Amino acid sequence: MLQVVQSPHNLVFMGSIRSVVACLSLAAVARKMTAATGQSVSGTSAAAAGLLRLTSVPGYDHNRVNDVLLLRPAAETQRRCDNETQNLQDGNDHVVFFPGDIQNFQQEMALQPDAAPWQCWSLERVGLTLAHRFPGCHIWVIRASQMYLHKFSCYQNFVESNLFGAPEHSADYGAIRHLRALLGHSMQQAGLPNPLPPLSGTSTPGPLPAGFSLTIVGFSKGCVVLNQIVYELAGARADPELQLFLDRVSALYWLDGGHPGGSETWVTDKCALGELASSGVAVHAHVTPYEVRDPMRAWVGREHRHFIKTLEDLGARVSHKLHFEDEPASIDNHFRVIQEF
């Protein structure tokens, strides 16, 4: 999360050694990924990196659309996995990533003075990093539907939000339904062989594709979508189609969640967390001092601790880690958690 109280120019750490190191590390990841695919990541064309950009993909209603970036599994990795495990779900493992503030497509970041220094965390670069982290999976990067001042991500299609992206959570906004439909339409547009079927609205829905599994990752502002999903779990389970979809979610990753609101950075409602715990989904929380040790936003750390303790008390499958705990809090390390988790 970019802190609104600061000048945008103060957020740009032009001379940061850590930023340079992080960008070089990302470049190394990109080279490794493209060596596996035989493709290039140089230049501004996402297609050159094996990335497919889908624009204005609709969700469950045509008023909610998102741009989506897809990186298919490297063919070599997929063949190796298929040979090792007969029931590898036919390459039907998927990872959905919700980015944070300032993260956008590379070309668009290059045009914005405040965003240009952070191009190594563009949607394309992060997609390549995630492909390295989750080999053999389809990587889906969901661009926020609005970017106020080209910096502040707003996930209005998933959760009621103000211009700066601060959420107002509810139990029935439709984030899960939108994600289910958005992913299905994206698969169809990308020409994947086993797409999710369209939502039918019937009480006896057809089965999902064999072996379909989903991991959902949120970073910084993107964690508001995961929080909204948690608040919707109880209601969504009453819907047969959404229940089938939720049953295929294997893991949720919160990466240094943050937003400009004054509370609810982490879910603390015990009933909502009870639904999450009973789902059996693996919960992973990775944080840095930038968010959980900021004295000006002390509630973030308190809420994070409450989130973890409540889930542990409820018997959830939860893991957590504080990264860079011996280093000063910095926005550089905030971004680097994407590499380290």
UniProtKB/Swiss-Prot annotation:
Full protein name: Mitochondrial protein C2orf69 homolog
Primary location: mitochondrion
Summary of the function given for this chain in its UniProt record: May play a role in the respiratory chain.
Key words, A-Z: Electron transport, Mitochondrion, Respiratory chain, Transit peptide, Transport
Transit sequence range: 1-35
PANTHER family: MITOCHONDRIAL PROTEIN C2ORF69, UPF0565 PROTEIN C2ORF69
One cellular component term from this protein's GO annotations in UniProt: mitochondrial matrix
Family: Belongs to the C2orf69 family.
Record's subcellular location: Mitochondrion matrix
